[in-house]
Design a protein with these regions (language model features):
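Conserved, single-site charged/polar hotspot
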Residues: 2-6, 10-551
Length: 551
């Protein structure tokens, strides 16, 4: 199935780059007090800015108008839709006792670190005739579609059928609730209990104060968090697939980019890098609108999508890049590219298939991240362990050579490896999750670009294989999959642990953000930078002939 852009109106597209007058016009705010109009080039997108409101009974959200403005609340009553005008509103949570326990149950077919691999898994299940949906309760998961498998009998029949065919990863996730979170607010002495609320502002800017509690981790205790953001567009509070609430920001794409670009690439980065990042961020957003269909919104506001901080911190350089590239996207054969980027590549970018499961993208190739001829991958494949280790000794001639994460080393004991791996396997409900000891870890296979494709862990219960980007979830040290292992021995020559010796930060597919800095400083413009990291792709104005993605 092809998902295409809406029809393009008949108008002249122009660049804001050269004309002083046009530049001044383009740098005006992207929203105004008069409101905003959705166009094919500036469609309104739905961002889950607070994804799990109500997880804690102490969660609070305060929505405020900016000075000189007011908020309009819209909500359902038995008599129809009612509206109220206020300066601010405080949303709180009360745990509502249930007359009878509520059982929520789903068949989880697979669990993944990333949406990309989850989507490939979903497509494989669909090819087998199983109706599925993608969700993200914590990790990304593929569920048997709840509307289709809507009874305990049908769900158990499906699970038993899969197990009879040898499937060991699918499981039944069952939760029993004696109470559920209910959002409420108090207005003029009356308490309103509602599951949906729409909030607009005359000037299309709403301030959000979020108060919540961050759960304790292995290295940090539980702590209270208070954060204030400003969002353009409107807000909607709605139920999600997990029994809590999501605050959704409905915002024009170009306004959304103001809260993304400076926080992804850095507000004071070289300007050509900011331009390249802007085109990628726009392309990424439009290509990934399907990510949260299960929750009835489109994108999140963190690193599982793109970091989005609203309008509280916007900067002239990124605003200028957004205005000057208005409507420009990166395409390959009239389809939006998978506009991937990471902090640093470690000197060589990865193919899509080096990191995730799914079809290769022809424009996402393994490229030595250097303007110079420092290594020839066609003659010295990094799948060869000796070549790879020699490559990792190189420190000069690369775009990222001055970056701290270009090369790194982290030592970890077998005990720590085992503890971290056990947590990972328990979340996946892996059959060997209750192992007691790890005796050996090894790299089994790596790609021609040097990325680790598979690792094997020997435990007292048997071997466990970890592949591709799951490696970064299963082990604590590696911040990329571009690494090798060095054993560390005790004084008595028994194995104590391993040093992970590697390079880069992130998945390494597509554009290296720090690599783009060097290319920009060499005088490359944004389009040339994108051409380097996405060979064969083209920067074009968004139009109705462009396919957003293929399902």
């Amino acid at each position: 199935m092809f998902v295409q852009a809406p029809p393009t109106p008949n108008y002249k597209w122009f660049s804001c780059i050269s004309s002083t007058v046009f530049t001044a016009l383009c740098l005006l705010p992207i929203f105004s007090a008069a409101g905003y109009a959705q166009t094919p080039q500036n469609r309104v997108i739905k961002i889950g800015v607070v994804q799990r409101f109500g997880t804690k009974a102490t969660d609070k959200l305060t929505l405020k108008a900016i000075p000189g403005d007011s908020l309009t609340l819209s909500y359902k009553t038995p008599q129809g839709t009612e509206t109220k005008t206020v300066a601010s509103i405080k949303l709180e949570i009360a745990n509502k006792p249930l007359e009878a326990p509520l059982v929520e149950e789903r068949v989880v077919l697979s669990s993944h670190r990333s949406f990309e691999s989850a989507e490939d898994s979903a497509n494989q299940w669909r090819a087998k005739g199983i109706d599925v949906e993608i969700a993200q309760p914590l990790r990304w998961q593929v569920w048997a579609k709840r509307d289709t498998y809507n009874s305990p009998l049908v769900r158990r029949w499906l699970l038993q059928s899969l197990q009879a065919q040898g499937n060991k990863t699918a499981f039944l996730d069952t939760k029993v609730f004696k109470q559920i979170p209910q959002t409420f607010w108090v207005l003029n002495g009356f308490r309103f209990n509602r599951n949906e609320l729409d909030v607009t502002a005359g000037k299309n800017v709403i301030e959000v104060l979020e108060q919540t509690t961050q759960e304790a981790t292995a290295i940090e205790p539980e702590k209270a968090i208070q954060e204030t953001r400003r969002y353009g567009g409107s807000l909607r509070l709605q139920k999600n697939a997990y029994g809590t609430y999501t605050l959704v920001n409905e915002v024009p794409t170009e306004t959304y980019l103001r809260g993304v670009v400076p926080h992804e690439i850095g507000a004071f980065s070289p300007y050509a890098s900011i331009v390249a990042q802007t085109i990628l961020a726009r392309t990424y957003a439009l290509r990934n609108l399907r990510r949260f269909a299960v929750d009835n919104y489109e994108l999140c506001a963190d690193v599982n999508c793109q970091v989005y901080k609203g309008l509280a911190e916007v900067y002239p350089q990124s605003d200028r890049a957004i205005a000057q590239t208005s409507g420009l996207v990166l395409t390959y054969e009239n389809q939006l590219v998978d506009a991937l980027y990471s902090a640093s590549s470690g000197g060589v970018t990865a193919r899509f298939g080096d990191v995730w499961h799914g079809p290769e993208r022809p424009y996402l190739r393994s490229i030595v991240d250097s303007p110079n001829n420092v290594w020839d991958l066609s003659k010295q494949s990094l799948s060869d362990e000796n070549n790879f280790r020699r490559f990792m000794t190189l420190k000069k001639g690369f775009n990222e050579e001055k970056e701290e994460t270009f090369r790194w080393r982290e030592e970890v004991s077998l005990t720590s490896i085992g503890g971290f791996l056990k947590q990972y396997l328990q979340k996946k409900k892996h059959p060997l999750a209750n192992f007691k000891t790890v005796t050996q870890v090894e790299v089994v296979e790596r790609s021609p670009a040097g990325r680790v494709l598979q690792m094997k862990v020997q435990t007292d219960l048997g071997p466990i294989d970890i592949d591709k980007d799951e490696i970064r979830n299963a082990f604590y040290p590696p911040i990329s999959t571009l690494f090798y292992l060095e054993p560390i021995y005790n004084a008595d020559k028994t194995l104590n642990g391993y040093a992970f010796v590697g390079g880069g930060f992130g998945h390494g597919v597509g554009m290296s953000q720090t690599g783009s800095y060097n290319l920009a400083n060499l005088g490359w413009n944004g389009s040339r930078i994108l051409g380097f990291y996405f060979p064969g792709a083209q920067v074009v104005p968004l139009g109705d002939a462009i396919t957003f993605w293929r399902e």
